[in-house]
Amino acid sequence: MHDLIQGWTHFQSGKVRDLYRDADGEILLVASDRISAYDWIMPTSIPDKGAILTKLSLFWFEKLSGITPHHVISSEVPATVKGRAIICKPLTIFPVECVVRGYLAGSGWAEYQTNSQVCGVPLPGGLLDGSKLAEPIFTPATKAAIGYHDENISLDR
């Protein structure tokens, strides 16, 4: 299920990423090609998805490095995971997923149907599943374990 990487011990897998630890306590974060949608891992994968996710992450960590510190130590990783992994400092995880929505769909649509808002952000009446929003909205969610659904949370929480 997970890679065997010399010098690294697998200790956790998420929906899309696998985590390994070395003797010094550093973390190897490996992005897989797994697909996760609606909080479930799909049976198929997307070739090179892990490499693309890693490149996107590195781009944003570099872009924001003058604004905020991050956990990345290096992108120089073992050859078996080159291009789809980073070495990181161990941190305490804040289990919140940051979602920016441009369209009303998924859990946002479900919440809207009950109270005409998503994560405490009021939206106009009459929207339909898949409606384009006038402007993107920030809708954080809890980061649930595999097999459980993330839950939208209000910005007031």
Model-derived features: positions:
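Active-site loop/lid in soluble adenylation, ligation, and acyl-transfer enzymes
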Residues: M1-I146
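Acyl/amide activation-and-transfer machinery of modular secondary-metabolite enzymes
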Residues: E151-R157
